Amino acid sequence: MKSLFDRTRVYTMTGEGSVSAEGADGIVVSLADNGSLALKDGCSYDDFDALCRANAQTDAEILLYIPALDEEQRKLLAHCAIRNAMWNRILFVSAAHKTLDALKAEYPEARISPVCDDNMVRPWIYAAYMGAPAYLMEAKEILLDADAWGSPTVDRAHNANVCIFAIGADDEDTVKALVRVGCDAVLTHDAVMARGLVW
């Protein structure tokens, strides 16, 4: 099975502000519950603005993991992304699905991605219904039903035209298995290792 992209993408979870040095496709950052952006030691919304500016001239994407946010916080993030011409390269990721739903209602062009776990039945249908181009799931859950020919989980996501991103792809065997079954992206702490396996 092939990825919906031209190849499996690599997103670095190192917490650095720019991904160009590692050659990854994107960076994963988390907005903390208190409104600080967790890069290395926790930063402010201003640092999200700086992160957008630092990556505006690259092809890098930002996977921004957000907690439950109120309307004002969602507006602040959206305007920051739009102001820096990064809107189409930010994927708002969250386990707070109501926040994603509200963000999508307020900004229909927002790219959202729910975090799903093994308790969710048919997450690909759920993601498609939300208007999400992708959903995130633990690598071990994606590989649970995998065999030599692929993974029904990945196949079903692709049949729904939804990408599946794997969290926790930090060793060679896991990355190789995810690429083999057609996973669309891996989120890793070792982008150099993963990049060498997918390119």
Question: What residue ranges belong to the model's regions?
Answer:
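Phosphate-group recognition and catalysis centered on beta-loop-alpha active-site segments
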Residues: 1-199
